[in-house]
């Protein structure tokens, strides 16, 4: 129910979590936000704000995200006047977004994509790497020959291959392999998607 994507950059890999918009998946949306410091509100220029968007914004505001960026997509499907009206509507209806960074983009024409990528690449990392390791598991499955695999987001700390960890039940487990941001790794860090 959660979508994941990664953007490799020169010095780091950005991870994206696409949370479901439908209200019946609200619990999944909340699970996807664990360990996340920045949010992007994605609004299609030709569709505007959906009912679920209002609910998600209320949650993001309550969770006190460091920053909520507004990305208006599909700019090629709307006039400049429609885009400006949408931006004004967002700022009027959600005053806490008035000072947010706004990006007008189009995947078809490439408009605004480089500016958004550059902005994201320069955001400060806020991961709590120097704290004890905490990991929110969102999926568990078995792989023949590998054993139990868990996926989730690291909230704090770091983990390495052969580390021994404790589950919330008190059961001790050992880390055999790590995939960080969908890539094999020796170590996983706070803020990363890990398996």
Where are the predicted features?
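Conserved Switch II/interswitch segment of TRAFAC-class P-loop GTPases
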Residues: 12-14, 19-24, 34-57, 61-84
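Switch I (effector-binding) loop of TRAFAC-class P-loop GTPase G-domains
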Residues: 1-10
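Alpha-helix C-cap/termination motif
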Residues: 32, 63, 93-97
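Alpha-helical scaffold elements adjacent to nucleotide-binding pockets in ATP/GTP-utilizing enzyme cores
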Residues: 28, 52-59, 85-93, 115-120
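Conserved catalytic-core segments of large NTP-driven translation/proteostasis enzymes
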Residues: 75, 92-195
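Conserved alpha-helical scaffold flanking the Walker A/P-loop in AAA+ ATPase domains
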Residues: 3, 28-30
């Amino acid at each position: 129910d959660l979508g994941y994507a990664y953007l490799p950059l020169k010095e780091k890999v950005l991870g994206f979590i696409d949370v479901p918009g439908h209200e019946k998946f609200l619990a999944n949306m909340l699970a996807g936000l664990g360990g996340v410091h920045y949010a992007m509100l994605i609004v299609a220029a030709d569709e505007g704000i959906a009912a679920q968007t209002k609910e998600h914004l209320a949650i993001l505001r309550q969770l006190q995200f460091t920053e909520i960026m507004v990305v208006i997509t599909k700019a090629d499907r709307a006039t400049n006047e429609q885009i400006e009206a949408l931006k004004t509507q967002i700022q009027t209806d959600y005053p806490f977004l008035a000072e947010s960074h706004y990006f007008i983009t189009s995947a078809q024409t490439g408009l605004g994509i480089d500016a958004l990528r550059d902005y994201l690449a320069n955001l400060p990392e806020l991961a709590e790497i120097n704290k004890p390791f905490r990991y929110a598991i969102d999926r568990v499955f078995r792989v023949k020959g590998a054993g139990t695999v868990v996926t989730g987001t690291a909230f704090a700390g770091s983990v390495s291959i052969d580390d021994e960890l404790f589950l919330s039940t008190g059961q001790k487990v050992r880390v055999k392999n790590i995939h960080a941001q969908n890539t094999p790794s020796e170590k996983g860090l706070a803020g990363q998607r890990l398996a």
